Protein backbone atom coordinates (compact mmCIF):
# COMPACT_ATOMS: atom_id res chain seq x y z
CA UNK A 1 0.00 0.00 0.00
CA UNK A 2 1.12 3.54 -0.76
CA UNK A 3 0.61 6.15 1.98
CA UNK A 4 1.45 9.79 1.18
CA UNK A 5 3.43 8.65 -1.86
CA UNK A 6 5.51 6.07 0.02
CA UNK A 7 5.17 2.29 0.34
CA UNK A 8 4.14 1.46 3.89
CA UNK A 9 2.82 -1.70 5.53
CA UNK A 10 0.73 -1.47 8.72
CA UNK A 11 -0.92 -4.02 10.96
CA UNK A 12 -2.55 -4.01 14.40
CA UNK A 13 -2.29 -6.97 16.78
CA UNK A 14 -4.36 -7.53 19.90
CA UNK A 15 -2.85 -9.36 22.87
CA UNK A 16 -5.19 -10.21 25.72
CA UNK A 17 -4.09 -9.57 29.29
CA UNK A 18 -0.69 -8.05 28.43
CA UNK A 19 0.38 -4.70 29.80
CA UNK A 20 2.07 -2.01 27.77
CA UNK A 21 5.34 -2.62 29.67
CA UNK A 22 5.27 -6.38 28.99
CA UNK A 23 4.56 -5.81 25.29
CA UNK A 24 7.34 -3.20 25.06
CA UNK A 25 9.81 -5.63 26.62
CA UNK A 26 8.78 -8.53 24.37
CA UNK A 27 8.95 -6.42 21.19
CA UNK A 28 12.27 -4.80 22.10
CA UNK A 29 13.78 -8.24 22.75
CA UNK A 30 12.37 -9.59 19.47
CA UNK A 31 13.73 -6.69 17.43
CA UNK A 32 17.15 -6.90 19.08
CA UNK A 33 17.47 -10.68 18.80
CA UNK A 34 15.92 -11.32 15.38
CA UNK A 35 16.38 -8.10 13.41
CA UNK A 36 19.39 -6.26 14.81
CA UNK A 37 21.56 -9.25 15.79
CA UNK A 38 20.13 -11.74 13.25
CA UNK A 39 22.35 -13.69 10.88
CA UNK A 40 21.51 -11.69 7.72
CA UNK A 41 21.78 -8.28 9.41
CA UNK A 42 24.38 -5.73 8.41
CA UNK A 43 26.23 -3.03 10.31
CA UNK A 44 23.56 -0.31 10.09
CA UNK A 45 20.84 -2.40 11.77
CA UNK A 46 20.00 -0.85 15.14
CA UNK A 47 17.21 0.15 17.48
CA UNK A 48 16.90 3.91 17.10
CA UNK A 49 14.31 4.72 19.76
CA UNK A 50 12.69 3.10 22.76
CA UNK A 51 10.21 5.33 24.56
CA UNK A 52 8.25 3.50 27.29
CA UNK A 53 6.19 6.61 28.12
CA UNK A 54 4.83 7.07 24.59
CA UNK A 55 4.96 3.34 23.76
CA UNK A 56 7.21 3.65 20.72
CA UNK A 57 9.95 1.30 19.54
CA UNK A 58 11.70 2.26 16.30
CA UNK A 59 14.44 0.39 14.46
CA UNK A 60 16.39 1.03 11.27
CA UNK A 61 17.24 -2.27 9.65
CA UNK A 62 19.77 -3.16 6.97
CA UNK A 63 19.89 -6.78 5.87
CA UNK A 64 20.56 -8.95 2.86
CA UNK A 65 17.60 -10.11 0.82
CA UNK A 66 18.58 -13.21 -1.15
CA UNK A 67 16.80 -13.92 -4.42
CA UNK A 68 19.01 -16.89 -5.27
CA UNK A 69 21.76 -18.57 -3.29
CA UNK A 70 23.69 -21.60 -4.53
CA UNK A 71 27.30 -22.74 -4.31
CA UNK A 72 28.07 -21.01 -7.61
CA UNK A 73 25.79 -18.01 -7.62
CA UNK A 74 24.50 -15.40 -5.18
CA UNK A 75 21.85 -12.90 -6.19
CA UNK A 76 21.11 -10.53 -3.33
CA UNK A 77 20.45 -6.90 -2.49
CA UNK A 78 20.88 -4.84 0.63
CA UNK A 79 17.37 -4.23 1.96
CA UNK A 80 16.84 -1.15 4.14
CA UNK A 81 13.66 -0.37 6.05
CA UNK A 82 12.36 1.20 9.23
CA UNK A 83 10.11 -0.59 11.72
CA UNK A 84 7.98 1.38 14.16
CA UNK A 85 5.90 -0.19 16.92
CA UNK A 86 3.19 1.82 18.73
CA UNK A 87 2.38 -0.08 21.91
CA UNK A 88 -0.61 0.26 24.26
CA UNK A 89 -2.17 -2.03 26.87
CA UNK A 90 -3.37 -5.18 25.11
CA UNK A 91 -2.38 -4.17 21.58
CA UNK A 92 0.35 -2.88 19.29
CA UNK A 93 0.60 -1.46 15.80
CA UNK A 94 3.58 -2.28 13.60
CA UNK A 95 4.60 -0.19 10.60
CA UNK A 96 7.24 -1.02 8.01
CA UNK A 97 8.24 2.06 6.01
CA UNK A 98 11.05 3.78 4.09
CA UNK A 99 11.86 0.64 2.11
CA UNK A 100 14.70 0.72 -0.39
CA UNK A 101 17.20 -1.63 -1.99
CA UNK A 102 20.81 -1.38 -3.08
CA UNK A 103 22.96 -3.85 -4.96
CA UNK A 104 26.50 -4.38 -3.69
CA UNK A 105 28.80 -2.86 -6.33
CA UNK A 106 31.62 -5.31 -5.53
CA UNK A 107 29.52 -8.40 -6.33
CA UNK A 108 27.20 -7.04 -9.02
CA UNK A 109 28.32 -6.30 -12.55
CA UNK A 110 26.92 -3.24 -14.27
CA UNK A 111 25.52 0.05 -13.06
CA UNK A 112 23.64 -1.08 -9.97
CA UNK A 113 25.06 1.39 -7.47
CA UNK A 114 21.86 3.43 -7.41
CA UNK A 115 19.42 3.40 -4.54
CA UNK A 116 16.19 1.68 -5.57
CA UNK A 117 13.14 3.00 -3.72
CA UNK A 118 10.25 0.64 -3.12
CA UNK A 119 7.87 3.20 -4.65
CA UNK A 120 9.57 2.62 -8.01
CA UNK A 121 9.78 -1.17 -7.71
CA UNK A 122 6.99 -2.89 -5.79
CA UNK A 123 3.84 -0.82 -6.38
CA UNK A 124 1.14 -2.17 -8.70
CA UNK A 125 2.24 0.21 -11.47
CA UNK A 126 5.85 -0.99 -11.32
CA UNK A 127 5.59 -4.67 -10.42
CA UNK A 128 2.69 -5.84 -12.57
CA UNK A 129 2.70 -6.47 -16.31
CA UNK A 130 0.84 -4.07 -18.60
CA UNK A 131 -2.39 -6.06 -18.46
CA UNK A 132 -2.11 -6.24 -14.64
CA UNK A 133 -2.52 -10.00 -14.32
CA UNK A 134 1.03 -11.19 -13.58
CA UNK A 135 4.14 -9.97 -11.82
CA UNK A 136 6.84 -8.43 -14.01
CA UNK A 137 10.06 -10.41 -14.20
CA UNK A 138 12.44 -8.16 -12.25
CA UNK A 139 10.32 -5.81 -10.15
CA UNK A 140 7.84 -8.60 -9.40
CA UNK A 141 10.67 -10.49 -7.74
CA UNK A 142 11.36 -7.49 -5.48
CA UNK A 143 7.66 -7.24 -4.64
CA UNK A 144 7.13 -10.89 -3.73
CA UNK A 145 10.32 -11.18 -1.65
CA UNK A 146 9.55 -7.90 0.16
CA UNK A 147 6.01 -8.98 1.04
CA UNK A 148 7.25 -12.39 2.20
CA UNK A 149 9.82 -10.71 4.45
CA UNK A 150 7.22 -8.27 5.81
CA UNK A 151 4.89 -11.17 6.64
CA UNK A 152 7.73 -13.02 8.37
CA UNK A 153 8.66 -9.99 10.51
CA UNK A 154 5.07 -9.13 11.47
CA UNK A 155 4.29 -12.76 12.35
CA UNK A 156 7.49 -13.00 14.42
CA UNK A 157 6.53 -9.87 16.37
CA UNK A 158 3.05 -11.24 17.00
CA UNK A 159 4.37 -14.60 18.18
CA UNK A 160 6.96 -12.91 20.43
CA UNK A 161 4.16 -11.10 22.28
CA UNK A 162 1.71 -13.99 22.37
CA UNK A 163 -0.76 -12.43 19.94
CA UNK A 164 -3.12 -14.73 18.11
CA UNK A 165 -1.95 -15.23 14.53
CA UNK A 166 -4.61 -16.46 12.16
CA UNK A 167 -3.53 -19.36 10.00
CA UNK A 168 -4.83 -19.97 6.53
CA UNK A 169 -6.83 -23.17 6.40
CA UNK A 170 -6.86 -25.04 3.13
CA UNK A 171 -9.49 -27.67 2.59
CA UNK A 172 -8.92 -30.47 0.11
CA UNK A 173 -11.96 -32.11 -1.41
CA UNK A 174 -11.52 -35.35 -3.30
CA UNK A 175 -14.02 -36.06 -6.04
CA UNK A 176 -14.46 -39.50 -7.56
Language model features with spans:
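Ser/Thr-rich, low-complexity intrinsically disordered terminal regions
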Residues: 1-176
Amino acid sequence: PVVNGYVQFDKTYYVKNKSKAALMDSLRNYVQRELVDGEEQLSQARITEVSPDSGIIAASIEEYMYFKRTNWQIHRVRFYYQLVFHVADGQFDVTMRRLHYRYDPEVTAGEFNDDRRAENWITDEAALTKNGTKLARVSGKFRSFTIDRKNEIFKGAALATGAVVKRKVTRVVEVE
